[in-house]
Structure formats: C-alpha cells, structure tokens
C-alpha cells in the first residue's frame, strides 16, 4: 500500500499467489459473508441485502466440510443469518461486533481450536472486525496526515486526512492479526499442511467505496499460500469471486462440488494450470436498509466495468455516510472539484463504463462515447443474461415491500 505497510500480508503473498482481479459480489458485510460461506451469487442464496437472511434451504461451509470430516470454526465477526444455516463452532478471542470501539483480541481460542485433535482436519475462519468503522484500533499516530496520499474520489480536507489515518491504523492492526495467526501455525508445525487464504471484506467506509459497485467497493485483496501446491511468488490476473472459495475448500477436502454452487474451485489456478477462471465478474447492490432503495447491477471483463444504475432518477443516500464527520467536511467545500466528486457520488447516470486499466479509480465515464458503444452493448447483454439466469428482476426486486397485513389495511382505506 502507498500509505500503509502490511508486512505480514505481504509475506503471505510472497509465499504463495497474489490475485490481481479478485472481487466480492456485494460491497457490504452480511451479503459478502453469505457469498463466501454458501458459494452462491447474492440473488441465488437470497440474503443479498445487508442484515438479511439466506433462503431456508441454503447450505454453507460448516455443513459441507463437516460432512467431509472437518471441524469448522469461526472466530470474530459473524454477521450472517439465520444462524441455523451456518453451524460454525464459535471460537472465542476476537470481537464479534463490528461497530464496537473495543478492538482488543487474544489468540488463545484459535490456538486451542487448531491443536485440539491432530487426527481431524480443521477449517478456521478468522473474521476480523478491522478495518470496519469506527476506526478506533491500531496506532494512528504513526501517520503524518499531511503526507497521506488520498484516492482521487476523496475530497481533501483535514478531517478526511484524520479519519483516513485512523482507517489505515486499523489496516495495520488487521495485518498484525494475520501475522499472529501465521506464527501460531508455524509454532504448531501446521504451516506445511495448511491452505491459508486472506481476503478483505469490501471497500473502506468512505463515500464511493463500500456500498457501491465501483472498483473501490467490489475489488478485493486476495492472497493464498499452500506449501507444496502453490509456488512462492505467483501472481494471476484471472477473474475470481468470493463464491469460488467454498468450492475450493470442498475440492481440497476431497469432496464433490454440488451443482447448486455458483463458484468454481481455484485449485487449477493455484497450481498454475490456467491463467483464466471466470470470463466476467458480476455485482449487485441494494441500498436497503442502509438508505432508500438504489438498485445497481454491474459486470467486469477484467479490462472494462459496466455499471447499470436501475433508478438513475433517484438521489443516492447512505445513512451512515451522511452523518460522518468527514462527509460533513466534504459538503462544506465550495470548489469545482468538490462539486464534481459529490455529484458523482449522489447523482448517477443510468450507465457507467470505465476502462479500469487506464482509469482504476473510475473517474472518466465512457458510456456515452461512440467509440465504446460496442463494448457497452456487449457487457449490457451479458449482464442482463446473468440477471435472467439468477432470477433477478432488477429494481422491483430491490424495493422494500410492506408486510401483507399493512398492504391489506392500506387497500381497505
């Protein structure tokens, strides 16, 4: 990272493979986890809105690997529903509440889980709450606010720099947790026989990242290490999504990946047998319950990203961001650049098209340029094809519906 040093995550990447085109499908907490643990795209598992539940018949990681003889534990943040569909063993030591100001943790629980029964293989999810807001962990004093390099979609204010330093401090704390976990594996002589995958959750909780379908929200950090299988120092630009993790684990455990799972095993990518994986990455967004409905769908082929804002006549509002101190400092700025950034965030056209190689921060919309009309048409067609396959009816699917009794009462009046 330009601003922050992540020595433990960097070391993990050097030991194995770095994914340059890894994506989540929904850039918010609960549905991201649902996708990881079920291997299904958001509309397929049903829990595509934040704080929502997956469909009753959906199975998940602990069930699949449990049936293959593994014990499956989860330490840290849960944020999945309903719990009956996710029968993880609860491993203590890491905070579960993502908005808690307390970021203290200990590793005793994960140590005991790892060494409990040497005859039984294990799968452990260490789900850190860092770097989720309110950014109270780590040491922010190490960052010189004036020297921080802000992303171009940020409005540069003193308050922004202060909160960005706090965010980076929590990234540093997350990196330390990765180092702690790797040290335990080493001390327990488990490192040589363990597949370790690190992924980020979603983009940072600044405007234009989390809760959006721009790259800053859906593009993810992902590295994997597996001695004897993954060669050190590998990199890949293969398009992968979080739905690929569960089928990978099933494959590694010797199981057969069921047809209901949307993702594909990454083992061939790990072994360098292929340089490609998916042709496209897909993303959905539904703002409810974080604000008024604002449905978005998007697709990327690795070079271009198409974003389809299904209700462009609406103004985008995300309730957590609206109250943030740094965001209030943005609104107070009266410059052309500040107005441009705020308008990009709040008022969006129906279609956005970006060359993510030349314009990684997606500041130059190509959707209305004749030169890119063929690419726009191709990606629009492929996105609509995927939506149909996923039984995604678009804007109507995302608008909240009143409970049946309230609907009946309104009709009688």
Language model segments and positions:
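Formylglycine-dependent sulfatase
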Residues: 1-352, 360-399, 403-413
